[in-house]
Amino acid sequence: MKNRIVLFLILLLIFSCDSNKNIPVDLKTEYSINPLGIDTDLPRFSWKLPQNSNVKRQLFYQVLVADKIINLKENKSLVWDSGKIKSDKNFTVFDGNELLPNTRYFWIVKIWDNNGNESSYSIHSSFQTGIKETWSAKWITDKEDINEKRAPYFKKEFKTHSTIKEATVYIASAGLHNFKLNGNNVGDEFMNPIYTRFDKRILYNTYDVTELIKKNNIIDIVLGNGWINHQSIAVWDFHKAHWRSRPRFIFEMVINYKDGRQEKIISDKSWKTSFGRIQFNSIYTAEHVDNNKENKSWKQVIEVPIPTDKISSQQLPPVRKVKAYPAVSFVKLSDNTYLYDFGQNMSGVTELKIDGPKGTIVRVKHGEQLKDGRLDNSGIEVHYRPKDDKDPFQTDIYTLNGNGQEIFSPIFNYKGFRYAEV
């Protein structure tokens, strides 16, 4: 009798282990892991079976969605229960109660296999809905026109009043934006948002800034021309685009406190604007930075009309810096000129660490090929139509302030290059 009990327990244990091997993994919403800014009312869910699974075929699945993890565990107050669905497909489309904007949801899934075995529920995944059509903020910019070459800087100070549960930022820009909160870069993306036709649609980015919020806070935003204001002229005629304007943006921070209160920090006339280090930026050519220029004479912003009626969440992989390549060699061309070889052609930017006397001007010219030992951009420069020599092609220009080591790297431009002539 004891042997039978032991055998029965062993069989139960084996069954339990097999069941645990079959728990779905790699849960994604709209093809992303725990995404923010989901705009669609019908998000798509997908999952996989683990590599060590003994399941040959999934026969059924069940998905649960809730706005609290505890509700998933207790199977109550669900936003959606798919029920037991007969299907061998590892994806489904949400079909539950209306999803609220700026709300985090959690979901789990379990499956039944071809042997009739039921898995345990997966570890929960999450997604957060976007702001949709509920913007309270205003579009703002400075008072300059499309001919102003200096980049506009913006700031806003605010205080929090209690313990924060979570804080989410939504920001859209006609042009490119670089966003800092309390001196910290927000997000690891580069040159956001992705290009669209600005008269048809503009994309907004979503950031979880909960960990960056303090009692006293300052928001810093600088805008780049991007595709909204082409000041460099080329054969593609983007400088003639009918949507051309001074860069502008809209910003909304939603702060949820643990005591249940909600507060919004929005872009409006209370923000201030100034000029700073970036003296010129062009997505075609380069960026010019003067470290002697500081943000002074902060002025009031102006509110401007919305550039388009359609503002959508950016739900595609952004541009990111993915790898650093040190120079593999360099040669001295003259007393003040050096040529660096990075070993392969790439789309990217250079980062320059340098110290020198105040007012020293450093030019970093990028290119893909050499001719007689010097950088040769003739193959691509034929498309460029400069008015003067102040905006040389693929050449960043930096002016030193003389205060020790300085670091330069463009934030609103990238190059195609293997070589850099400094």
State the predicted function of each range.
Residues 15-16:
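C-terminal motif of bacterial Sec signal peptides marking the signal peptidase cleavage site
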